[in-house]
Amino acid sequence: MGSMSWIHWVIVLGIVALLFGGRGKLSSIMGDAAKGIKAFKDGLKDESSSEVADNKAKSALPRTEAEAEELRKS
């Protein structure tokens, strides 16, 4: 229990190889993750801004004839 088995060493070596093996591997992985998160946030902004624009356009129009007449009088 005190010493690590061979499978533990394989996992540790795999993590070390991922972190330090090759120039810029970790930074490219993190950069790709950041790009994915940014694209997701931009997609949410686009979706919510188009919904807000649709709601503003709909609310700007009078809903009934009485509201239309009130707007004409003022």
UniProtKB/Swiss-Prot annotation:
Transmembrane region(s): 1-21
A GO biological-process term: protein transport by the Tat complex
Compartment(s) where it occurs, according to its Swiss-Prot or TrEMBL record: Cell inner membrane
InterPro entries: TatA/B/E, TatA/E
Membrane topology: Single-pass membrane protein
Molecular function terms, GO-annotated: protein transmembrane transporter activity
Region (Disordered): 51-74
Positions with biased composition (Basic and acidic residues): 64-74
Top-rank taxon, per record: Bacteria
Keywords annotated in UniProt: Cell inner membrane, Cell membrane, Membrane, Protein transport, Translocation, Transmembrane, Transmembrane helix, Transport
GO cellular component terms, A-Z: TAT protein transport complex
Assembly and binders: The Tat system comprises two distinct complexes: a TatABC complex, containing multiple copies of TatA, TatB and TatC subunits, and a separate TatA complex, containing only TatA subunits. Substrates initially bind to the TatABC complex, which probably triggers association of the separate TatA complex to form the active translocon.
PANTHER family hit by this protein: SEC-INDEPENDENT PROTEIN TRANSLOCASE PROTEIN TATA
Function: Part of the twin-arginine translocation (Tat) system that transports large folded proteins containing a characteristic twin-arginine motif in their signal peptide across membranes. TatA could form the protein-conducting channel of the Tat system.
Family, as annotated: Belongs to the TatA/E family.
NCBIfam families: PRK00720.1, tatAE
HAMAP family: TatA_E (MF_00236)
Record-given protein name: Sec-independent protein translocase protein TatA
Organism of provenance: Caulobacter vibrioides (strain NA1000 / CB15N)
Origin organism lineage: Bacteria, Pseudomonadati, Pseudomonadota, Alphaproteobacteria, Caulobacterales
Originating gene: tatA
